[in-house]
Amino acid sequence: MAESKEARDQEMNLKEESKEEKRRNDWWKKDPQGPLESDQWCRVLRQSLPEEKIPSQTCIARRHLGPGPTQHTPSRRDRWIRGQILQTEVLQERLEWRIRGVQQAAKELGEVNRGIWRELYFREDQRGDFSAWGGYQRAQERLWGEQSSPRVLRPGDSKRRRKHL
């Protein structure tokens, strides 16, 4: 008789263990939630974006309003306020995502510009800096009153008229 009791205890233990394992395997499922605390609303409604340091006006308004209807049927004014707050939260999230997009584009633009300047500096290191050459040439022409290199074609004079010379 003692053996049968032990066997039953072992079966019960196995059942409890399997239930616990099932619970452990369900860790990804959401726990059934009661009414949320008023501070939790901001985090829950915008889980995709991290909570900003300074709470926005909308978050402050929601905290002031408190959690959803728990004991009573809300009045029309209460429902309207809640609707407006939801709408502002949606707009706020859209705005934040837009800001993120602009920041991302600015970052990419900065990277491209840095790449361009890196290549320019590399070219300058390889071939030397000729950016001031045109100014130097013009200064020489002004000083001496003649073109420094008449072989270079200007838009005004073509080689055609000098061909027979």
From Swiss-Prot:
Entry coiled-coil feature ranges: 1-26
Region annotation RNA-binding (RRE): where it falls in the sequence: 57-130, 144-165
UniProt entry tagged with the keyword Coiled coil: yes
Record's GO cellular component terms: host cell cytoplasm; host cell nucleolus; viral envelope
Keyword terms, alphabetized: Coiled coil, Host cytoplasm, Host nucleus, mRNA transport, RNA-binding, Transport
Residue numbers covered by motif Nuclear export signal: 32-55
Sequence motif Nuclear localization signal, residues: 159-163
Role, per record: Escorts unspliced or incompletely spliced viral pre-mRNAs (late transcripts) out of the nucleus of infected cells. These pre-mRNAs carry two recognition sequences that function as Rev responsive element (RRE), that are not present in fully spliced viral mRNAs (early transcripts). This function is essential since most viral proteins are translated from unspliced or partially spliced pre-mRNAs which cannot exit the nucleus by the pathway used by fully processed cellular mRNAs.
UniProt free text on domains: The bipartite RNA-binding motif binds to the RREs present in incompletely spliced viral pre-mRNAs. It consists of a central region, and a C-terminal region that also contains the NLS which mediates nuclear localization. These overlapping functions prevent Rev bound to RRE from undesirable return to the nucleus. When Rev binds the RRE, the NLS becomes masked while the NES remains accessible.
Name of the protein this chain belongs to: Protein Rev
Lineage: Viruses, Riboviria, Pararnavirae, Artverviricota, Revtraviricetes
